A protein has these predicted regions:
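Acyl-thioester-dependent condensation/acyltransferase catalytic cores
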Residues: 1-54, 61, 65-68
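Acyl-thioester-dependent acyl-group transfer interface
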Residues: 4-29, 148-320
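Gly/Ser/Thr-rich phosphate-binding loops and adjoining beta-strand/alpha-helix segments
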Residues: 25-43, 103-167, 291-294
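Non-catalytic, low-complexity flexible loops and terminal extensions
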Residues: 38, 50-125, 313-320
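Conserved residues at beta->alpha junctions
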Residues: 46, 114, 297, 301
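Phosphate/oxyanion-binding loops and surfaces in catalytic or ligand/nucleic-acid-binding neighborhoods
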Residues: 49, 62-70, 205, 209-212, ...
Length: 320
């Protein structure tokens, strides 16, 4: 618990993101409370083997329900994504390393901005008119802003890793588990697409991510990698090949429950904040709370002005 009224949530989140979990020491979960007289901040972090970003949002809901006097029942252990999808689940046939010394990365920088409810509504309306998702619109803003600032982004193909929620496909509601599948938007260097043309391109690039064929293929690839008893070097190369996108962008969508819990109210939510251990990586998180779109940027080597640039591109595209 941190009781200092001057504690900054950005610094605390950065330290949590930078603190590794020991895989064989449960629980693979941590919680931090920044407490003040009339406000408090919960920071929930976990190993990705335990749950995903949506799960942590539901856990935060349960914490607020408990604090407001609701009795909560214990839930059964959720089956794995593989079991729910009916896919063959394979594991390694050799024990893992007893320890592995990895160099600690630089402390990341975390920052956030939020649009007003009016600006968020304008963005939603314009995206609907253009036939694209909010995720696609933010991806376009991210691309334009990043390439305006960073020469490497301008002169190289841009890969945007975009994890997609598949709870509805798996028949899930608020279970605490991993229920995402990987997607990626690939944008060649150069080009002269307008903002909304770029947004439509991004939407098309993710159109098949939630198909049963793609989910099955992704699960099979993951299981094959795990069951092949990779060496440390092989695992490192696999991570570089699969997760080496310049940016990971996760949109958790609209808060799936009311933000008022008796005398308590959830005012803001900055999520998700995660790192992959890739050189130069940028992570963008998005979630809409109380009608306001919240954007969070996390990186050990942040592109200066990226988040402000994204906000500005969204404003220009929607005339807000």
């Amino acid at each position: 618990m941190v009781t200092s009224p001057f504690a900054r949530w950005q610094r605390e989140i950065a330290e949590e993101v930078n603190e590794p979990f020991t895989p064989d020491q449960a629980p693979l979960f941590r919680a931090v409370l920044l407490h003040q007289e009339t406000h408090c901040i919960f920071i929930l972090s976990s190993h990705h083997a335990v749950c995903d970003g949506s799960s942590r949002i539901f856990l935060l809901r349960d914490i607020l329900l408990a604090l407001s006097g609701h009795a909560l029942e214990a839930l059964p252990l959720a089956p794995s994504r593989e079991n729910l999808f009916g896919a063959q689940q394979r594991t390694s046939t050799e024990p893992g390393l007893p320890s592995f010394a990895a160099q600690r990365p630089l402390l990341p920088r975390v920052e956030g901005v939020k649009l007003t409810p009016q600006q968020t509504m304008a963005l939603q309306g314009r995206a609907r008119e253009e036939g694209v998702t909010i995720h696609a619109a933010i991806s376009a803003a991210l691309t334009i802003a990043g390439r305006a600032i960073d020469e490497n982004w301008r002169n190289s193909p841009l890969r945007i890793m975009s994890p997609a929620e598949i709870r509805n496909i798996l028949g899930l509601k608020d279970q605490c588990m991993v229920s995402v599948v990987g997607g990626e938007i690939f944008i060649a260097s150069g080009g002269s697409m307008t903002f909304w043309e770029l947004a439509r391109f991004a939407k098309d690039g993710l159109s098949a991510v939630k198909s049963r064929e793609n989910i099955s293929r992704k699960i099979d690839l993951h299981c094959t990698a795990v069951s092949s008893n990779l060496t440390v070097e092989q695992a490192f190369q696999l991570k570089r090949n699969v997760f080496n996108a310049q940016v990971m962008f996760t949109n958790l969508g609209r808060l799936p429950f009311d933000s008022t819990f008796g005398p308590l109210k959830l005012e803001t939510l900055w999520a998700p904040c995660a790192l992959r251990g890739i050189e130069g990586e940028q992570t963008l998180g998005a979630v809409t709370v109380n009608g306001s779109l919240h954007l969070t940027h996390t990186s050990p080597a942040p592109i200066p002005g990226l988040l402000a640039g994204i906000e500005e591109e969204l404003r220009k595209a929607c005339a807000i």
